[in-house]
Amino acid sequence: MTATKQHKKVILVGDGAVGSSYAFALVNQGIAQELGIIEIPQLFEKAVGDALDLSHALAFTSPKKIYAAKYEDCADADLVVITAGAPQKPGETRLDLVGKNLAINKSIVTQVIESGFNGIFLVAANPVDILTYATWKFSGFPAEKVIGSGTSLDTARFRQALAEKLDVDARSVHAYIMGEHGDSEFAVWSHANVAGVNLENYLQDVQNFNGEELIDLFEGVRDAAYTIINKKGATFYGIAVALARITKAILDDENAILPLSVFQDGQYGFNEVFIGQPAIVGAHGIVRPVNIPLNDAEKQKMQASAKELKAIIDEAFSKEEFAAAARN
């Protein structure tokens, strides 16, 4: 960890449900000293209104400069957070959003780079693993300075679901979801533990709990977004707090280990793809990935997830408007 400057600046691109919830989380938690909110021209006044509304909470939290921003404001930002994109509708998978959101992502990243920005990108728009890869390609940045929210929310859901079943605090449950933030994600059961006790051993002392319940629990975690979208139209609170946690780790140079969408350089037998795994993150971005030794079944799931993402990337970047970036 290194000494960090006192004034931390975040630019948020996208003031929809996720973006505005993230901004609210930053204000509530006293994260960053400056927050600029960028929206498309026809929604600029909404960003102005949200900035004003959020500023009225500052007397209860901590000082912060909050305003509706423009892309030139990215020049001296420490972090640009991208939540903008077409929302996932009922019946859609995250991967269905690829075509719509790649073009949006290219426009955003191009304008951020033109400002002279040299900080860190944090991507949350879906499909997040694909769009993190796209941000890396469109920006030309080193891979360690481009981070996706990855399986951070999935992991939080997993820990909370286990905690509820076991009647313990979720913060005492240590377990990860890895792979795609989506349908091919998987639970790393082999290393799940409660306060250091292997989950399998811990369950021996828990009555009326069987293996089938674990399968149902994981499926509930994997499909949680669909459940929420069908009931209320979108998910935003959980991912907003996950983004706030990642933001704090970066701005405070914590060297925290978080499950993120990070660049693969042979860690699990594949390259040139961003996918969810634990990684050390601090002021300069990804310090290094943390490679959990997966069992054979988990390795197969990780490789299948990566293969699916790679196929989608190759198809998407074969299109003329994105092909030049793919060759860089």
Swiss-Prot record:
GO terms for cellular component: cytoplasm. It is an enzyme of class 1 (oxidoreductase). Homotetramer. The modification Phosphotyrosine is found at Y226. GO terms for molecular function: L-lactate dehydrogenase activity. The active site is at H181. It comes from the Bacteria. One of its GO terms (biological process) is glycolytic process. Pathway: Fermentation; pyruvate fermentation to lactate; (S)-lactate from pyruvate: step 1/1. Substrate binds at Q88, R94, N126, P127, V128, D129, D154, T155, A156, R157, T235. The lineage of its organism: Bacteria, Bacillati, Bacillota, Bacilli, Lactobacillales. Catalyzes the conversion of lactate to pyruvate. Its EC number is 1.1.1.27. It catalyses: (S)-lactate + NAD(+) = pyruvate + NADH + H(+). Its main location: cytoplasm. HAMAP family: Lactate_dehydrog. It comes from Streptococcus mutans serotype c (strain ATCC 700610 / UA159). Belongs to the LDH/MDH superfamily. LDH family. Beta-D-fructose 1,6-bisphosphate binds at R159, H174. This is L-lactate dehydrogenase. Allosterically activated by fructose 1,6-bisphosphate (FBP).
